[in-house]
């Protein structure tokens, strides 16, 4: 089989919901293994937590506040020695909505 010019494909996935993220990772792993490529990962990266503090009432009662948080879960995986068939299969792959994908060749 012919290999792509680079030694690996690095895929970084981000999502607010870790269950959707894990489903997307499983689809990528199955696709890559079916085309004969080996995989390193998925490696869970640290979760970014953004916290927002808001007053509960508009004008009075400064001591009464509410906190909200937004968690961004991330995974990193490398596809080692990808073939052209692997690249084509990853390009045609349909991932769940809400998953941000960064691919570096």
Swiss-Prot record:
Protein name: Small ribosomal subunit protein uS10
Family: Belongs to the universal ribosomal protein uS10 family.
GO terms (BP aspect): translation
GO CC, alphabetical: ribonucleoprotein complex; ribosome
Pfam families in UniProt: Ribosomal_S10
Function, in words: Involved in the binding of tRNA to the ribosomes.
Organism: Lawsonia intracellularis (strain PHE/MN1-00)
PANTHER family the record matches: 30S RIBOSOMAL PROTEIN S10 FAMILY MEMBER (PTHR11700)
Subunit (UniProt): Part of the 30S ribosomal subunit.
InterPro entries for this protein: Ribosomal_uS10, Ribosomal_uS10_CS, Ribosomal_uS10_dom, Ribosomal_uS10_dom_sf
UniProt cross-references to NCBIfam families, sorted A to Z: PRK00596.1, rpsJ_bact
Keywords: Ribonucleoprotein, Ribosomal protein
UniProt keyword annotation of Ribosomal protein present: yes
Ranges in coiled-coil conformation: none
GO-annotated molecular function: structural constituent of ribosome; tRNA binding
